[in-house]
């Protein structure tokens, strides 16, 4: 049996908000395969968000979210990736992940559910395949590495 070190959650967007969470485990294949598959299942209507996190030290309940996590919202063809990571001052901040390239065209709004949506720039839109690389790096390191840039997420009136 695998030691559970991470949890995961899927958010279902249509109708009343529903979520399913539990341990992040690999039944067959690799963790890279698992993360890619979960992100490929996002359709922007029924499955609208996916997140993973490392369990806090000593925690065994996979639904307990630690200080850091990574999440994606949207569809397999166009999704945003956000990560709550530790900063140099020792506190966790939420960031939108983007590529190091100029913004082209107008912003895109990603629908999450009947109560939430997020607007991102063109360099902050990813496919499931692109996002899976970011997710795997986060799974292994609890961080988002180069060549990506992080823009602090504006919580606005939240």
Model-predicted regions and their roles:
Residues 1-49, 84-158:
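Acidic, proline/glycine-rich low-complexity IDRs
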Residues 43-90:
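Amphipathic, interaction-prone secondary-structure segments
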């Amino acid at each position: 049996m695998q030691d559970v070190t991470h949890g995961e959650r899927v958010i279902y967007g249509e109708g009343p908000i529903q979520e399913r969470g539990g341990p992040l485990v690999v039944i067959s294949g690799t963790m890279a395969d698992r993360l890619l598959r979960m992100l490929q299942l996002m359709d922007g209507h029924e499955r609208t968000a996916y997140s993973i996190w490392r369990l806090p030290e000593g925690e065994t309940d996979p639904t307990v979210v630690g200080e850091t996590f990574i999440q994606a919202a949207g569809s397999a063809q166009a999704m945003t990736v956000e990560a709550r990571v530790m900063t140099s001052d020792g506190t966790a901040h939420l960031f939108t992940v983007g590529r190091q390239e100029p913004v082209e065209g107008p912003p895109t709004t990603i629908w999450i559910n009947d109560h939430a949506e997020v607007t991102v720039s063109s360099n902050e839109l990813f496919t499931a395949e692109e996002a899976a690389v970011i997710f795997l790096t986060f799974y292994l390191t609890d961080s988002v590495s180069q060549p990506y840039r992080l823009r602090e997420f504006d919580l606005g009136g939240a």
